[in-house]
Structures are given as structure tokens and as C-alpha cells.
Swiss-Prot record:
Its main location: cytoplasm. This is Secretion monitor. Regulates secA expression by translational coupling of the secM secA operon. Translational pausing at a specific Pro residue 5 residues before the end of the protein may allow disruption of a mRNA repressor helix that normally suppresses secA translation initiation. It is found in: Cytoplasm, Cytosol; Periplasm. One of its GO terms (cellular component) is periplasmic space. Coiled coil: none annotated. Residues 1-37 form the signal peptide.
Length: 165
């Protein structure tokens, strides 16, 4: 019975916890941290009557602000990154090789991965610059519904001039 428990503990220590922490680190890179300031900047939901009206002047800025994370690293995120660095540094320790052999590309990749993770802990994240000057596309409103225009918009098919005027 104790052998089963020992094997289970070894399995958890070797495989489960390192992969769980690596998953936490990988998942946290893609998810923005929400704060009260970010929630107040999001536009309010429009009603059904104003759903057809879209303001294109600030659309790109709103889309970029919703996508951009706050670049904050909390304690548990730092803890997970440090643990992953520790596990990777032990797993990627160089083997005893003769001195004459050149380092392999895989070793260079491992070193680059460790340098990137350690730089995330030591360097301060800077948000990307917001582009203030936008070129807006001209959208001509259609006055009447036509099947060829609908097909060309929905499926990208265009067989002639869009307007005959």
C-alpha cells in the first residue's frame, strides 16, 4: 500500500504540478487582467433601436483598448513563472558532453526560453503606443435592398460596378 502512495506522490511531483504551473503561466499570458478602470472605459450596450448606427470614428481605439492587458503581474503569477523557471532549468541542465562538440540548436532554444521567462520577471512591461491618427474608410449607405449587392457583400462576389450612377 505504501508503494502505491509513494508512486502516486512521485507522479504528482514529477508530472502533475510542473505541468499545472506551466499551464497557469501559459494561460495567463493570453488573458488580460481586469480592473475597475478598464471596466469603466468599455462602452455601454446599445439598445435595439440604435444597433444599426455604428460610430466608426472611435471603433479601432475601442477594439484596441478591449484587447490590451493592463501589464500587471501579481504575486501568484510571479510565483508560477519562478517555479517554471526552476523546473525548466533543472530539466534543461546540460549533460556531460565532450568539450569539442558544438552546442545544439535545442540547447540554444532552451537558453532563450529561460532568458525570456527571467526577463518577464525583471523587466517592467510597457504597453504599446496608441495610434491617434486613423484613416477612416468611406461607407456609402445603400438606399434599397438588392440581391446582387447582398451576395457581393456576404460572399465577396463582385461581377461589375457597385453603383451605376
Amino acid at each position: 500500500m505504501s508503494g502505491i502512495l509513494t508512486r502516486w506522490r512521485q507522479l504528482g511531483r514529477r508530472y502533475f504540478w510542473p505541468h499545472l504551473l506551466l499551464g497557469m503561466v501559459a494561460a495567463s499570458f493570453g488573458l488580460p487582467a481586469l480592473s475597475n478602470a478598464a471596466e469603466t472605459n468599455t462602452p455601454a450596450r446599445t439598445t435595439a433601436s440604435t444597433a444599426s448606427k455604428v460610430n466608426f470614428s472611435h471603433f479601432a481605439l475601442l477594439e484596441a483598448s478591449n484587447r490590451r492587458p493592463n501589464f500587471t503581474v501579481d504575486y501568484w503569477h510571479q510565483h508560477a513563472i519562478r517555479t517554471v523557471i526552476r523546473h525548466l532549468s533543472f530539466a534543461m541542465a546540460p549533460q556531460t558532453l565532450p568539450v569539442a562538440d558544438a552546442p545544439s540548436p535545442l540547447q540554444a532554444h532552451h537558453i532563450a526560453l529561460l532568458n525570456t521567462l527571467s526577463a518577464m520577471l525583471t523587466q517592467e512591461g510597457t504597453p504599446p503606443a496608441i495610434v491617434r491618427r486613423l484613416s477612416l474608410a468611406y461607407f456609402a449607405p445603400q438606399t434599397a435592398f438588392s440581391i446582387p449587392a447582398w451576395i457581393s457583400q456576404a460572399q465577396g462576389i463582385r461581377a461589375g460596378p457597385q453603383r451605376l450612377s
